């Protein structure tokens, strides 16, 4: 039972209430009739359980005491062991200190002994070396030919021979020239021979890329006067093979990267050697390559493209190679690049302007030749003005208007070609012009573009377009092509603006030339806008003039004053006018853009309103005719809705309200006149329309018009 209690106590978490519940449940289950409650049995069970728990507590207490005693004894044992270990550790520290003192003492004696040995050995070594050199010197001092020593004849002992001859050469430089001239000549000859053999050996090692051997030989040669020959030999042999076929630029950077790693390992002064390596590429390889490519100047366009490509690729190459240059030579590559191209850059600007002029002129000639058109000097509108003056005063048409079959003589393709040529020229200009000449050169190129594209092409087309606009108040509906001229002009101007912002302005911004550029462009745009406005005004006048003449001759008096009742429909003249105006509105909306579109549509609508208003003022209206007039005005209103102009819509709404004055009964005139639409109009306008009624003489003396015509 005690073991069962222990199992329950060891469960986590232990709940006293649950333990008592389980004990009560077990007691009830042990009885025969478990449904009855037996308090006595339960009491006995609790008493027995309490006794068992006390016994269990005593056992556990005894077990704890034994474990605590065992722990105390083990702790004392470990403490004694630690104390003994500490004593032994201290003893070891003392012994180590004594040993360290002895080692330092022995080391000091050894160093002292080594110094003494070195002091004794150094003079001896020098003496041996001096004796060795004297033996070699005696051979060179002896009369007759030099007896070739083994050290100079054995290729395996080349390094040793180089050391000897270098020292002998240094000694010989201090000998007086008189008695020792022959000996000095022999030494110099052998010196040159050994030096040549070293360079040849270095070249052989370079071919097999034996880095260690090259490094050793370079160190030896660094003591010789021909060390630069070693560097030159390395550079010459490294750059002997073609870099990359016909395109020299592709192989230069990989070549430099490869040899930079070798130079770093081989030479003691790698930065100077690498600078000379790159210098040789620029002064020999690149310079010769550029001269070959640029020797033919007959095809100027090809020459300029080649110059730009070579110069830009050389600049990029300089940027890529800058990491291999020392800080002292920071601007060396830039100077080398200028030396290569200086002759070509000097005459660049003149050739560029000449080439662009020729290209633009050729494009213009090809365009007009394709149109079979011979350019002629325009009369600047003088003839046109005379025709208008004579036609107005004499009421005759003295000559037919030449409209060239609707040809605008404007070409977006031509403009794009010219702009592309100018863009390429400006791109070259930004790269090939120096900082002080760039703004002036860019302005010259821009002037050429403006001359050919805007003055000789667009302005010429505008002049022809202005002359081709039909005269106003013609009886035949005018064929209008100037709107197409406007559309193409706008496209060309937008393309020009885009080019200027991307290619011209960056060249002249923040310079005195910028104000010159802005002034020229403003004058040019003002001239273009003036002619566009003039042409649009003439075109609108031609259409509105035709409406005026057409209504004047085709609108019958009986349309608005029929003698018999007729169907209430729009007049034929009105329908014809609307039919002709709708395509014009569509064409205007297609060809004009921006704020100009709204201005043109509003101007068109207001002039149309004035013509129709004046036309209605010439008519007399009875009731049936007034209905017809209202139908006509409604047709006009439908037409002008496409103008999207609030002002024009309002004008025709008022005109519609005025036409209602022709229809309403006399007793309702006061009410209509005081309505929202007509209330703010001048009474004279209202009075003029009321006077158009056929019954006006009857009603003018009645009270119906009181306050209106007074």
Curated annotation (Swiss-Prot):
Transmembrane segments: none annotated. The keyword Protein transport applies. GO terms for molecular function: beta-catenin binding. Keywords: Coiled coil, Exocytosis, Protein transport, Transport. GO terms for biological process: exocytosis; Golgi to plasma membrane transport; neurotransmitter secretion; protein transport; symbiont entry into host cell; synaptic vesicle docking; synaptic vesicle targeting; vesicle tethering involved in exocytosis. It holds the Pfam family Sec10_N. GO terms for cellular component: exocyst; presynapse. Residues 44-96 form a coiled coil. The keyword Protein transport applies. InterPro entries: Sec10-like, Sec10_HB, Sec10_N. The exocyst complex is composed of Sec3/Exoc1, Sec5/Exoc2, Sec6/Exoc3, Sec8/Exoc4, Sec10/Exoc5, Sec15/Exoc6, Exo70/Exoc7 and Exo84/Exoc8. Belongs to the SEC10 family. Component of the exocyst complex involved in the docking of exocytic vesicles with fusion sites on the plasma membrane. This is Exocyst complex component 5. It comes from Drosophila melanogaster (Fruit fly).
């Amino acid at each position: 039972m005690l073991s069962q209690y222990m199992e329950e106590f060891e469960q986590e978490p232990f709940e006293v209430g649950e333990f008592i519940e389980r004990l009560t449940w077990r007691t009830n289950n042990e009885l025969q009739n478990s449904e009855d409650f037996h308090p006595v049995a339960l009491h006995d069970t609790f008493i027995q359980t309490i006794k068992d728990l006390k016994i269990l507590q005593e056992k556990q207490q005894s077990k704890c005491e034994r474990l605590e005693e065992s722990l105390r004894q083990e702790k004392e044992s470990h403490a004694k062991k630690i104390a003994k270990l500490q004593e032994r550790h201290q003893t070891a520290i003392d012994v180590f200190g004594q040993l360290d003192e002895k080692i330092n003492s022995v080391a000091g004696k050894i160093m002292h002994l080594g110094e003494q040995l070195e002091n004794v050995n150094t003079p001896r070594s020098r003496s041996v070396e001096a004796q060795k050199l004297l033996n070699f010197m005696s051979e060179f001092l002896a009369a007759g030919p030099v007896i070739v020593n083994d050290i100079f004849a054995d290729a395996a002992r080349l390094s040793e021979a180089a050391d000897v001859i270098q020292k002998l050469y240094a000694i010989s430089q201090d000998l007086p020239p008189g008695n020792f001239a022959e000996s000095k000549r022999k030494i110099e000859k052998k010196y040159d021979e050994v030096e040549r053999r070293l360079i040849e050996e270095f070249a052989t090692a370079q071919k097999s890329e034996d880095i260690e051997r090259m490094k050793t030989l370079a160190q030896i040669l660094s003591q010789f006067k021909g060390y630069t020959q070693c560097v030159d030999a390395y550079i010459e042999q490294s750059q002997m093979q073609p870099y990359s076929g016909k395109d020299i630029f592709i192989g230069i950077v990989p070549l430099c990267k490869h040899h930079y790693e070798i130079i770093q390992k081989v030479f003691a002064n790698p930065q100077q050697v690498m600078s000379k390596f790159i210098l040789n590429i620029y002064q020999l390889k690149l310079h010769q390559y550029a001269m070959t490519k640029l020797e033919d100047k007959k095809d100027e366009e090809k020459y300029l493209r080649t110059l730009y490509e070579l110069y830009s690729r050389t600049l990029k190459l300089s940027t890529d190679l800058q990491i291999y240059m020392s800080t002292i030579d920071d601007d060396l590559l830039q100077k080398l690049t200028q030396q290569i191209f200086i002759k070509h850059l000097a005459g660049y600007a003149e050739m560029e302007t000449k080439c662009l002029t020729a290209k633009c002129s050729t494009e213009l000639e090809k365009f007009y030749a394709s149109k079979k058109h011979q350019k002629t000097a325009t009369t600047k509108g003088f003839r046109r003005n005379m025709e208008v003056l004579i036609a107005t005063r004499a009421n005759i048409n003295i000559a037919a208007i030449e409209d060239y079959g609707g040809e605008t003589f404007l070409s977006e393709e031509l403009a794009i070609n010219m702009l592309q040529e100018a863009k390429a020229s400006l791109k070259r200009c930004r790269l090939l012009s120096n900082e002080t000449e760039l703004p002036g050169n860019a302005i010259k190129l821009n002037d050429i573009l403006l001359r050919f594209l805007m003055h000789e092409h667009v302005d010429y087309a505008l002049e022809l377009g202005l002359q081709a606009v039909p005269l106003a108040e013609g009886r035949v509906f005018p064929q209008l092509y100037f709107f197409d001229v406007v559309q193409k002009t706008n496209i060309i101007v937008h393309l020009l603006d885009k080019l200027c912002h991307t290619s011209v302005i960056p060249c002249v911004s923040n310079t005195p030339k910028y104000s010159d550029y802005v002034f020229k462009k403003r004058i040019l745009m003002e001239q273009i806008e003036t002619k566009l406005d003039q042409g649009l005004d003439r075109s609108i006048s031609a259409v509105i003039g035709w409406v005026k003449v057409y209504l004047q001759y085709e609108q019958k008096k009986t349309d608005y004053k029929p003698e018999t009742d007729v169907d209430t429909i729009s007049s034929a003249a009105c329908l014809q006018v609307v039919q002709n105006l709708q395509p014009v509105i569509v064409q205007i909306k297609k060809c004009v853009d921006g704020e100009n579109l709204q201005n043109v549509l509003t101007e068109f609508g207001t002039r149309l309103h004035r013509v129709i208003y004046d036309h209605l003022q010439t008519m007399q209206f009875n009731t049936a005719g007034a209905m017809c007039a209202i139908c006509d005005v409604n047709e006009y209103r439908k037409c002008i809705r496409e103008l999207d102009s609030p002002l024009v819509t309002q004008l025709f709404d008022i005109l519609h309200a005025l036409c209602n004055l022709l229809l309403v009964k006399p007793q309702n005139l006061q009410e209509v006149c005081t309505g929202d639409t007509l209330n703010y109009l001048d009474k004279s306008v209202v009075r003029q329309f009321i006077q158009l009624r056929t019954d006006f003489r009857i009603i003018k003396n009645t009270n119906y018009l009181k306050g209106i015509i007074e």
